[in-house]
Amino acid sequence: MSLRQNALNAYRNGLRATRIAFGGDTRMLLASRAKMREGMENPPNPELSKEQQIKHLEDVATFLKRNLVQGRKEGTDEKYHLNIHKETELGDNESIKQTKKTLVSQGGGCCGGGKDLYK
């Protein structure tokens, strides 16, 4: 594929990603699409090669689809409805559940000063 075709495909994927991420929020949808168009016309990092700029746009589209979730406040209490869609990446948080093997987590304090404090 030509460079022009690759750029056009990346732009289209970016527009699709904004529709997925901001589907119910017209203001954000229009703002994100305007920002994307501006970035295509005047690249924010012109020192990068065209291929790197295309790759960056593809990465942004992937991030928008997988990692961005919008919430909308429901009612008067502090409850929000999250717009989680089929492409949202849901982590399992296993790394958070594991205990850390640092001195601080074992009661050692900063720089090991309290290492024998809890024995």
Swiss-Prot record:
GO terms for biological process: mitochondrial respiratory chain complex III assembly. GO terms for molecular function: protein folding chaperone. One of its GO terms (cellular component) is mitochondrial matrix. It is found in: Mitochondrion matrix. Signal peptide: none annotated. Keywords: Chaperone, Mitochondrion, Transit peptide. The keyword rRNA-binding does not apply. Belongs to the complex I LYR family. MZM1 subfamily. Assembly factor required for Rieske Fe-S protein RIP1 incorporation into the cytochrome b-c1 (CIII) complex. Functions as a chaperone, binding to this subunit within the mitochondrial matrix and stabilizing it prior to its translocation and insertion into the late CIII dimeric intermediate within the mitochondrial inner membrane. Modulates the mitochondrial matrix zinc pool. Interacts with RIP1. This is Mitochondrial zinc maintenance protein 1, mitochondrial. It comes from Zygosaccharomyces rouxii (strain ATCC 2623 / CBS 732 / NBRC 1130 / NCYC 568 / NRRL Y-229). The gene is MZM1.
